[in-house]
């Protein structure tokens, strides 16, 4: 799959254009301030007037969003990157769990060109109203009413092509059968704390919050001074992240706290499997 940063000048210009066919409050934040100190807004923050112009002119046309953009996308990005897989498996349908992602964009293109039905989903709550997505799935799974409304308003979906699903993972979070007794959890290898201990759970924001060590250090000073009572600790869960540099950033950021007597580091399990999520569920449930 080609790197989206290596698709040529024409491809980059087209991606820039269709991305700003919407300009919501989220888009404005990304276009003017950015959300990461290590990355500038696409094209620089000074282009925000041009980005709003695209949204307020071309972005008002449903025809451009649903007809012209897919046509041009198909013409510019014309390589069949998934042809081997489709020829081998002949799928009846394709599920796209990350509609905003470049990988899913190209997979969706291949499926549409072959007449294969597609089901799409936003991988995160802000993916539908952040940038315009160039291709539509035949059926979009929306986790809540806000995502459904954004898909209709910003992504030009018809209501009859959207299904509300809720967040199935929330059912797991609320299921008491996965909760351990507090004393057992504190004694487990995940925590190793005294049975009567209390702890703050600090969930990292990674490069989005580069000054977190200052906050943690101040709280640890309060803990050491006894401001919260005896046997109080801090559990730090590093940002899960999707980028290796985010993980490296967190590893370096929290390295100085790993050996602090009042700190426990939560392991960085993903949410991909139930057994990997159980420790985090218990960390949240038993935090003081």
Model-predicted segments: where are they?
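Conserved acidic residues
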Residues: 90-92, 138, 198, 279-282, ...
């Amino acid at each position: 799959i080609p790197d989206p940063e290596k698709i040529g000048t024409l491809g980059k210009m087209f991606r820039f254009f269709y991305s700003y066919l919407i300009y919501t409050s989220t888009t404005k934040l990304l276009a003017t301030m950015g959300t990461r100190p290590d990355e500038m807004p696409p094209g620089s923050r000074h282009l925000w007037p041009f980005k709003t112009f695209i949204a307020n002119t071309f972005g008002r046309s449903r025809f451009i969003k649903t007809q012209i953009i897919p046509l041009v996308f198909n013409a510019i990005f014309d390589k069949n990157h998934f042809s081997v897989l489709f020829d081998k498996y002949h799928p009846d349908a394709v599920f796209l769990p990350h509609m905003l992602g470049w990988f899913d964009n190209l997979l969706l293109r291949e499926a549409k060109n072959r007449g294969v039905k597609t089901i799409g989903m936003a991988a995160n709550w802000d993916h539908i109203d952040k940038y315009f997505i160039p291709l539509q799935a035949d059926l979009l799974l929306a986790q809540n009413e806000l995502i459904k409304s954004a898909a209709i308003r910003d992504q030009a979906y018809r209501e009859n092509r959207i299904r509300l699903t809720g967040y199935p993972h929330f059912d797991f979070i609320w299921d008491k059968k996965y909760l351990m007794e507090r004393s057992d959890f504190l004694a487990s290898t995940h925590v190793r704390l005294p049975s009567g201990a209390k702890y703050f759970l600090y969930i990292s924001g990674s490069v989005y919050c580069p000054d977190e060590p200052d906050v943690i250090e101040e709280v640890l000073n309060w803990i050491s001074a006894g401001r919260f009572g005896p046997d109080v600790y801090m559990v730090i869960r590093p940002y899960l992240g999707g980028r290796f540099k985010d993980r490296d950033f967190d590893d370096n950021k929290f390295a100085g706290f790993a050996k602090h007597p009042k700190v426990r580091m939560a392991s960085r399990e993903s949410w991909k499997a139930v057994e990997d999520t159980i420790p985090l569920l218990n960390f949240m449930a038993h935090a003081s």
